[in-house]
Amino acid sequence: MPSPPYLGRFAPSPTGPLHFGSLLAAFGSWLLARHAGGQWCVRIEDIDPPRAEPGACERQLRTLAAFGLHSDLPVIRQSERDAAYTAAITRLLQTGQAFECSCSRADLAGMGGIHHACVAPLGERRAVRLRVPPQPPVGFDDALQGPVLQDVYAEVGDVVLRRADGYWAYQLAVVVDDAAQGITDVVRGADLLDSTPRQMVLQRALGLPQPRYLHLPLMLDRDGRKLSKSHDAPALDDADPLPALHAAWAALGQESDALPRHAAVETVLQHAVQHFSPRLLPRQRELDLDERASGLQRD
């Protein structure tokens, strides 16, 4: 049976403007999709309203457009996918693969942070967890980082699918949506590398296909922290995308002189597709941000 055509994705959360770390993931996933002759889509992971910033979704989409990164398919918003997540959880509950849980954070701390059995009686606030029984370690071969092996039972325990506050958990939503959209290749930051084995356990429980995975290096700021909105990472400049595009190209390990310095964004992206080489991608989990080289200096 032939493999389905390549479909990659970029899935930001609307917690603020896109920054250089976001661009690295978006540009990297877009380039890999184009290199494979496939498609690339955008999904907005807006399932955590308390963390969402008003207007961030629209701003993120405008930024992607300014950088020439247009979704080949209609943009999906997870906040509109309640029915799909409910169906998945209902199925798991009915088959005994998931259960309701009222254990508090204090209860979980008493278990060493790993849930294997409920210690609290069911109350009004109930999370839903995937039952993770003892099993052999889960492994996969990341296309960039190499072999990954994790004992999900011992290191993670029962995985939260719906939080006690009623919001959907990331692990459930991402697994359901990757399958529903037919995503064949997940390209994202290495901070999510350790989440992949638990997602694979959930994929198996739901009988869903497993995409291929490639985890790009995580961009660190000058203090050695993940470049993120919570750490005040500077927003990308929609009015002047070329410096950040060139910096992202270099951070992805590509030949710096392959892209024209002064050209339209579309022309730069055409050259990027022509000269992109996956074998040059840096095979490490973290990269230090060179603010001077990236053109992202603060005023």
Curated annotation (Swiss-Prot):
Coiled-coil regions in this chain? none
Q: Which keywords has UniProt assigned to this entry?
A: Aminoacyl-tRNA synthetase, ATP-binding, Ligase, Metal-binding, Nucleotide-binding, Zinc
User: Where along this sequence does the record place binding of ATP?
Assistant: K229
User: Which metal ions or organic cofactors does this protein require, according to UniProt?
Assistant: Zn(2+)
Question: What EC number(s) has UniProt assigned to this enzyme?
Answer: 6.1.1.-
Q: PANTHER family, alphabetically?
A: GLUTAMATE--TRNA LIGASE, GLUTAMYL-Q TRNA(ASP) SYNTHETASE
Gene name tied to this protein? gluQ
Q: What is this protein called?
A: Glutamyl-Q tRNA(Asp) synthetase
Instruction: List where the motif 'KMSKS' region lies.
Output: 226-230
Note whether Ligase occurs among the keywords.
yes
Motif 'HIGH' region: where in chain: 12-22
Q: Which Pfam families match?
A: tRNA-synt_1c
Q: Quote the function comment for this protein.
A: Catalyzes the tRNA-independent activation of glutamate in presence of ATP and the subsequent transfer of glutamate onto a tRNA(Asp). Glutamate is transferred on the 2-amino-5-(4,5-dihydroxy-2-cyclopenten-1-yl) moiety of the queuosine in the wobble position of the QUC anticodon.
Q: What family does the database annotate?
A: Belongs to the class-I aminoacyl-tRNA synthetase family. GluQ subfamily.
**One Gene Ontology cellular component:** cytosol
Q: How is the cofactor bound?
A: Binds 1 zinc ion per subunit.
User: Which residues are noted in the entry as L-glutamate-binding?
Assistant: R9, F10, A11, P12, S13, E45, Y170, R188
| Residues that hold Zn(2+) according to the record | C101, C103, C118
Single GO term (MF): zinc ion binding
Q: Give the UniProt record's GO annotations in the biological process aspect.
A: glutamyl-tRNA aminoacylation; tRNA modification
